Amino acid sequence: MSAWTMGAQGLDKRGSFFKLIDTIASEIGELKREMVQTDISRENGLEPSETHSMVRHKDGGYSEDKDGKTCPRDSGYDSLSNRLSILDRLLHTHPIWLQLSLSEEEAAEVLQAQPPGIFLVRKSSKMQKKVLSLRLPCEFGAPLKEFTIKESTYTFSLEGSGISFADLFRLIAFYCISRDVLPFTLKLPYAISTAKTESQLEELAQLGLNFWSSSADNKPLNSPPPHRPLPSAGICPASLRQLCLINGVHSIKTRTPSELECSQTNGALCFINPLFLKVHSQDLSTGPKRPSTRTPNANGTERPRSPPPRPPPPAINSLHTSPGLSRTEPQTSMPETVNHSKHGNVALLGTKPTPIPPPRLKKQASFLEAESSAKTLTARRPSRRSEPEPELELELEMGTAGHAGGAPPRDAPGDCTRAPPPGSESQPPPCHGARQRLSDMSLSTSSSDSLEFDRSMPLYGYEADTTSSLEDYEGESDQETMAPPIKSKKKRNSSFVLPKLVKSQLRKMSGVFSSFMTPEKRMVRRIAELSRDKCTYFGCLVQDYVSFLKENKECHVSSTDMLQTIRQFMTQVKNYLSQSSELDPPIESLIPEDQIDVVLEKAMHKCILKPLKGHVEAMLKDFHTADGSWKQLKENLQLVRQRNPQELGVFAPTPDLMELEKIKLKFMTMQKMYSPEKKVMLLLRVCKLIYTVMENNSGRMYGADDFLPVLTYVIAQCDMLELDTEIEYMMELLDPSLLHGEGGYYLTSAYGALSLIKNFQEEQAARLLSSEARDTLRQWHKRRTTNRTIPSVDDFQNYLRVAFQEVNSGCTGKTLLVRPYITTEDVCQLCAEKFKVEDPEEYSLFLFVDETWQQLAEDTYPQKIKAELHSRPQPHIFHFVYKRIKSDPYGVIFQNGEDLTPS
């Protein structure tokens, strides 16, 4: 057995997600077969009105068969015809099922009258976490069960599950089609699952919580399970069979790519897993050749059916406008690409832009089609595919569901050739599975769109600098104001010339990349758009303040007063926005709670500081020019530059001219930014570069006492007066929670270096800060921390020091990462793992304070207790101790003079 096959088996054992993918793929393939009845009936000489038509007319209705009979069908089948995926329905109706303020008793009262499978998402007051409340059948005993939703850095997942999602909507959409850790899949209310249009969903959403007690959801509790309509015997081939239902899931056969018909438009829509492409490519090359499909013509004779003509490349503005376009042409058949290509509607799926990115597959297909126009349409053997790297295995496993068929064209089994002439019956057309599937999937309206993951699909043709986090950090917000970074280009000798069409598509790829934004960036953009809308209270608040500040230049007496006022306004607006209902969907559904403040701070930078950047710079310059501080600084900069480094107290190696030019370029880049947080990031890079020069040229480590004179020397050599206002800008506008880390330390160092230059005198060595500069720093620190009576968890970096007491081994301690919503029960589980306790049920977490012991209850929050103890006027020495419950209450923790560092 080859190593690749063994690796594939290993992946298959732990990749249960792949089985789900194959199931969904075959399911969609069967659905597509059932939905081509109109096309088949025409070939058999039948009128469309004699079939079970799924044709959507302009009036939004659906035609029935001749008898007027209709068959019930499930909501997933309706989603295919209505182009409303599960994710669309969840997004439009979140005021119904997303009830974060609902109590446990109220949720139970709502779900008691609902059929099994109906759900709510609320926030538990006990755990301070979001929970999924699920209605259970009677045989489960309890009518309701709650599943905890875990929130990590920008991801959501259910407790006990290994699958994470970018936001709450995608999590719920996934569990509507797969149960994973749930006892069964979630079920949408009857009115939501049967709604035909977005306007109907919006009408339901306006009811909010009252939906559950209204007559809108009037499906009987014991109604039979819906099923899909049976295809007519005279219309559908014998291979189309009624699918059996097992627990609501169709029992279907999983097939390999070699078994799938991929040369016809009505072939099964499939997901080809790139991990097993090499294995199945052998089946494609050695398997039996299929005869060309034949269809009867008007005379009754058979003629070979040709593959459909390739759709033309998308319109020039299709990549930018497709998410917002509406459908205006009647759709005759789902897999039919000819009519769609004539009207330029190849890649249109959605009818209304939503806060989530549009489906990626249609854009990927559009780009691949444009790329393929430059290549000769000839069949070729499948290229070798290297084994995926270990760090990419999880990404492939998670991304295959939402982005199947998204592999590069060269990894596909082969390319389709043009239609053979009628005489060439014996030679079947070569098959191009991936290309055909991309074309079909661009027209697919299946609910699998809800499985798209933002960060799992690779960006082909996009080169990102992953060696530094700053490039990612500077990404979207400053692209309008920053000059493009200079990157080294490698000269490549190639005789291949890209056609103009491909070049045009490559230029528009930036529009495609916007669909890959993380929920954080989407929320920042949403808040920025809201700030420009004066129809909202938040927009009026921001626009009025920006206009007032620009029109009233005399309202501030100093630069510090102006910056403090802006910072105070940002804090107030951020607090309002965190409790406002103007954000739709709510920020809690897209961003984990411990990251909400960070995202709101970035949004404040974009919607307040960005429009004020030019005004603030001009005002700072006017203030410092009027008080004469810049004139004095300019003279002192010239004086310091004339001194030797040793006269400035520099006894470490200094940067050379080339390195000074790099530092000056970073300072110039800093001036173009409006975010104080990003300015600090660049300042940290400058300080890191200086430290690197000092250590590399001497071979020894240096401390802060040696660094400050070198930083003073570097600032003087850069000769930039604007650094004075840049440092003041950062010190006053930076979020106070960021002043306690590395950024605050080096920001203070830069302020001290400038103060040395401002107060430089010939008769004294510039080694010590003046008393005036020290007083300024003390006042600044006091001002930034006055209003923070109770320290937030960010002050302590989410760390908790826990001591572990054993009678035999004494006392040891560990620093654990404990977030604010982590309960004592969770901390005890973490301690049991860290300290390797064999019987954790006999241990608990205790608080030792004021010579007394107190066992903490399981539902308490150690970080909140820690914050309260730190905020007391008179500090108390306290310790968190993990020890046996039945032991000496005083123990030996502080015997023999041993003391632990306070938490």
From Swiss-Prot:
Which keywords belong to this entry?
Answer: Cytoplasm, Endocytosis, GTPase activation, Phosphoprotein, SH2 domain
| Residue ranges annotated for the VPS9 domain, each copy included | 627-766
* PROSITE patterns in alphabetical order: RA, SH2, VPS9
- In which compartments does the protein localize? Cytoplasm
Show the ranges annotated as biased composition (Basic and acidic residues): 56-73
Q: What is its main location?
A: cytoplasm
The residue ranges flagged as biased composition, category Polar residues, are 318-338
Q: Sorted alphabetically, which SMART domains does this protein's record hold?
A: RA (SM00314), SH2 (SM00252), VPS9 (SM00167)
Write out the biased-composition intervals (Pro residues): 306-315, 419-431
Give positions of region: Interaction with RAB5B.
506-775
Q: Which residues carry this modification: Phosphothreonine?
A: 518
Residue positions where Phosphoserine is found in the record: 366, 510
**One Gene Ontology cellular component annotation?**
cytoplasm
**Which residue intervals are annotated with compositional bias (Low complexity) in the record?**
439-450
- Where in this protein does the record put region Disordered? 44-73, 282-455, 471-491
The record's Gene Ontology biological-process terms are: endocytosis; positive regulation of endothelial cell migration; positive regulation of endothelial cell-matrix adhesion via fibronectin; positive regulation of vasculogenesis; signal transduction
GO MF, one example: guanyl-nucleotide exchange factor activity
Query: What residue stretches are annotated with the Ras-associating domain?
Result: 796-887
Residues covered by the SH2 domain: 97-190
Q: How does it assemble?
A: Homotetramer; probably composed of anti-parallel linkage of two parallel dimers. Interacts with Ras. Interacts with RAB5B, with a much higher affinity for GTP-bound activated RAB5B. Does not interact with other members of the Rab family.
What is the protein's known function? Ras effector protein. May function as an upstream activator and/or downstream effector for RAB5B in endocytic pathway. May function as a guanine nucleotide exchange (GEF) of RAB5B, required for activating the RAB5 proteins by exchanging bound GDP for free GTP.
Q: Which family does the entry's similarity section mention?
A: Belongs to the RIN (Ras interaction/interference) family.
| Protein name according to UniProt | Ras and Rab interactor 2
- Per the UniProt record, the source organism is Mus musculus (Mouse)
Gene this protein is translated from: Rin2
